A protein has these predicted regions:
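Interfacial segments of multi-pass membrane proteins
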Residues: 85-91, 171, 340-355, 361-365
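Membrane-embedded helical hairpins/re-entrant loop segments and their flanking transmembrane helices
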Residues: 10-20, 45-63, 279-352, 483-488
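N-terminal signal-anchor module of multipass membrane proteins
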Residues: 1-72, 79-93
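Membrane-embedded hairpin module used as a gating/binding unit in multi-pass transport
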Residues: 33, 191-195, 208-323, 327, ...
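Hydrophobic, membrane-inserted alpha-helices
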Residues: 34-39, 55-62, 79-82, 140-141, ...
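Short, non-helical or kinked segments that cap or interrupt transmembrane helices
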Residues: 46-51, 68-80, 125-134, 178-185, ...
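Re-entrant/interfacial helical elements at transmembrane boundaries that shape
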Residues: 38-43, 73-86, 293-302, 334-346, ...
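Membrane-embedded alpha-helical modules
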Residues: 95-207, 359-475
Length: 488
């Protein structure tokens, strides 16, 4: 592989890079998804190791069902958080399997839609998703995630900026392999900086929960900070202790955490089962819309029509089965990950084999609590700096989608659709509630994210407003031929 190919061209056959470089690229994809993937179990009380195991297995299953053509990684979905909180508000271990039961059924909704698309064709579905809808949705995906990145960066802007600068320098001025692994280098560089700072006298422990000392339920949150300043956080003491205490080998999940345990202990609560279904299954309608947006983003990034080949029905089937499988064994719902789409955009290595390698790494790490703890210990500002770039890249892909499809913003309908999608998606995401909450009865509510609401309203507006001129061409001309691993 010539240097010019590494620097300028999109790479479709990673084997031409050599085994060593492919391994490094696989690690880059794993590091990119890790922060968000382990955050979901941290918030809900689910197993981190089980999450990694079924993120890896789910990704491999997705690739198998999508004919190994789509370079997507499946990680933990944030869309179902409201469902987990509704069933197990305090992460009660005995209640989480009920929430997982609801999520498992939500995954089956994907399969139902996949069957309908296979039966009636993608045209009838994709006519509701023209570029004027998918473009703003993709833009909104990145912008809705941006607050998480900024909040993480704010724990130590110095470290976050170092991570960002490493990515920029490597991606713009890097040569050869350095240019295509900027995310990995950003993680490693900022991680090493945090290790050095933590080991020096400049760092001291600070209890971020000190204001709650003496109150009921008080738990210290000790964090190593530069100069004892909470605005310059490094490693948490808990993460360091986890590394020290974690075993090298361990099983990723326990039977009592699985959905099967509900029906084998003879104490299944039918009321909780019904609540789980009514609360969580409707969320799948929103996540399906997000799935189509993600696949559109990956298609735009890679330059291939994945809606046509391998087909939307296959990607939905892969996502749905991965979600159901993960949930049955007590892991969070899976979803195609925007972070990894950002990695594709930066590295320009589009070979799905690299993503599958990342999935294998995730599976291996799931059986080693020690290795998982080392990755989980990545300081929050490092994750923030990396995420800031990746989320921005997602939105940039949306902008490119709009530009390349030559959307006419001289038409009032196009302006209205784009405006409503963006304002609803971002506005609701940043509102006090963070979602639209729909009460069903005294004990059941449905929570829709800003992205879900914006997407659904945008789809409806596109369907009812006059002036539609978009025709989805399932047999659109494929991407230019690929040769020697590079698109010509």
């Amino acid at each position: 592989m010539s240097k010019s190919t590494l620097q300028d061209g999109a790479i479709y056959d990673a084997k031409t890079l050599g085994a060593g470089r492919v391994v490094v690229l696989g690690f880059q994809h794993m590091f990119a998804m890790f922060g968000s993937t382990v955050l979901v179990p941290a918030l809900t009380g689910l197993s981190v190791s089980a999450t990694l195991l079924f993120a890896g297995l789910g990704t491999l299953l997705f690739h198998l069902l999508s004919k190994r053509k789509v370079p997507a990684f499946l990680g933990s979905s944030f869309a179902f958080l409201a469902g987990y909180f509704a069933l197990a508000p305090n992460g009660e271990r005995e209640l989480l399997p009920y929430a997982c039961f609801g999520v498992a059924l939500a995954g089956l909704v994907y399969l139902l839609l996949a069957g309908l698309i296979k039966l009636f064709g993608a045209n009838r579905v994709m006519k509701f998703f023209p570029p004027i809808v998918t473009g703003p949705i993709i833009i909104a995906i990145g912008l809705c995630l941006s607050a998480t990145a900024i909040n993480s960066c704010s724990t130590n802007w110095i470290v976050a900026i170092v991570a960002i600068l490493i990515i920029i320098v490597c991606n713009i001025w890097g040569k050869g392999m350095i240019k295509i692994i900027p995310i990995l280098l950003g993680v490693v560089g900022a991680y090493v900086l945090c290790i050095i700072l933590t080991a020096t006298p400049a760092s001291s422990l600070v209890d971020l929960n000190a204001a709650l000392a003496g109150t009921e339920g008080y738990v210290p949150n000790m964090v190593h900070c530069i100069g004892g300043n909470a605005n310059f956080q490094l490693f948490t003491q808990a993460s360091i202790d986890n590394i020290k205490n974690a075993a090298w080998i361990g099983l990723p999940f326990q039977y009592n955490d699985t959905v099967f345990s509900i029906f084998t202990n003879g104490k299944a609560d039918s009321g909780l089962l019904i609540t789980a279904v009514a609360t969580i299954v409707p969320i799948s309608l929103a996540t399906i819309v997000e799935h189509i947006g993600d696949i559109s983003a990956i298609s735009s990034t890679v330059g291939s029509n994945f809606i046509k080949d391998p087909g939307l029905h296959r990607t939905l089937m892969g996502d749905g089965l991965a979600t159901t499988l993960a949930s049955l064994f007590g892991a969070p719902a899976n979803t195609t990950y925007g972070e990894n789409t950002g990695v594709l955009t930066l590295s320009k290595v589009f070979d799905p084999m690299v993503v599958r390698l990342a999935a294998v790494f995730a599976i291996v790490f799931s059986f080693s609590p020690k290795l998982a703890a080392c990755i989980s210990a990545i300081p929050t500002p490092v994750v923030g700096g990396i995420s800031l770039v990746l989320y921005g890249m997602i939105s940039a892909v949306g902008v490119r989608n709009v530009v390349e499809n030559k959307i006419d913003f001289g038409k009032a309908r196009n302006v209205i659709i784009a405006a409503i999608i963006l304002v609803l998606s971002i506005g609701i995401a940043y509102s006090a509630a963070g979602a639209i909450v729909i009460p069903i009865n005294a004990s059941i509510t449905i929570s829709l994210s800003g992205l879900a609401v914006g997407s659904l309203v945008g789809i409806i507006l596109n369907a009812v407003l006059p002036g539609k001129d978009y025709v989805f061409e399932e047999d659109a001309k494929d991407a230019p031929a690929k040769k020697d691993g590079k698109k010509k």
